[in-house]
Amino acid sequence: MNPNQKIITIGSVSLTIATICFLMQIAILVTTVTLHFKQYECNSPPNNQVMLCEPTIIERNITEIVYLTNTTIEKEICPKLAEYRNWSKPQCKITGFAPFSKDNSIRLSAGGDIWVTREPYVSCDPDKCYQFALGQGTTLNNRHSNDTVHDRTPYRTLLMNELGVPFHLGTKQVCIAWSSSSCHDGKAWLHVCVTGHDENATASFIYDGRLVDSIGSWSKKILRTQESECVCINGTCTVVMTDGSASGRADTKILFIEEGKIVHISPLSGSAQHVEECSCYPRYSGVRCVCRDNWKGSNRPIVDINVKDYSIVSSYVCSGLVGDTPRKNDSSSSSHCLNPNNEEGGHGVKGWAFDDGNDVWMGRTISEKLRSGYETFKVIGGWSKPNSKLQINRQVIVDRGNRSGYSGIFSVEGKSCINRCFYVELIRGRKQETEVWWTSNSIVVFCGTSGTYGTGSWPDGADINLMPI
């Protein structure tokens, strides 16, 4: 090949390579522009629809990086929109309960600024769990903590922290409330907050951080609600509220709420005679609550709520090992599913139970008369057989010598089933402990387990003599 031919050949090859590179650059440019505009096409509405001006909850925000000849292209995957929870999975099969969380609020109050609280509970959004309580508008090491044994003052607010974080000075005050309930519908939190005069209180309904609705007292005698989580199914949340006598006939209503707006109110129906402080859980496709009869029964009332047609059915837990305090001893106590047992019916304490086929899991104070100690167990046939008393899988959560208090249920959705968990309020201070002038609490939390477990006792643990007066 002569020199001229070599020059022509080299020139041709160079021109070909240059052309290929030019085409590749054009392809890269087109791809970059296409991906840049395509990310804005996600979930765009048809031309005949209006895009609603509402906040979007982003669950995932994934960035993929693709390398092409030293050019970086970022492609953003469209975020999946949050969906309402439907709680359609089955209930987890459990053998008992395992320790989950303890906040040690009273012990920490001996040397730090921790809120004075009572009426705690736990509820979870799809990602994490939170603890709630009704604060008294003061920390424990503060003269305002004097006489905080009282339930209803205008200074009480609903506090909210991630589970396991005590209520420190930076805690969010969600609303003004001396009675409350909270739940997450899959998109946002709903808070039901009751405050005001005993004879004319107001319940505010706060959804996604905004006041959406309210309702006033209908019986003019201490409007009150669950003091534990409400339940939302497919966007409809239910909350049980009572107004009227705490030791006689009262007026209980079940409110149905969608994104903070009351859409229906159903009166209590069925055989339950007195219903307060319900502990509710999803039982697809409805909601089931186990409550407190403060008038006639030491057996606990059941309220079944149909979310679709707003119908209500009520009865009592069948187990002859009853769940309220005070109560008769186990050899003398009874329950026949339909009516209050008229045994130690006055007074009572918030508690919980849940069905497991024909059986029932339940928790209660160990003491029959006082809010001290705490135990859980399963009663064979306790959900369906009148006066059933065969107890298995008993666990001590707090030993008899230490104080307990309210307790309630909350539900956690796993990959394949819905687990039931409970918390126990560990009350300290007045009225029983007169060395101090305050009344407050810490909590301990357990969740259902299908595994094995050991034994123990998890009391509050604060030495009252080391506490601020």
Curated annotation (Swiss-Prot):
Single GO cellular component term: membrane
EC number: 3.2.1.18
Virion surface topological intervals: 31-469
Catalytic activity: Hydrolysis of alpha-(2->3)-, alpha-(2->6)-, alpha-(2->8)- glycosidic linkages of terminal sialic acid residues in oligosaccharides, glycoproteins, glycolipids, colominic acid and synthetic substrates
Subcellular location: Virion membrane; Host apical cell membrane
Cofactor(s) this protein requires: Ca(2+)
Binding site for Ca(2+): D293, G297, D324
Keywords: Calcium, Disulfide bond, Glycoprotein, Glycosidase, Host cell membrane, Host membrane, Hydrolase, Membrane, Metal-binding, Signal-anchor, Transmembrane, Transmembrane helix, Virion
Identification of the protein by name: Neuraminidase
Organism encoding this protein: Influenza A virus (strain A/Niigata/137/1996 H3N2)
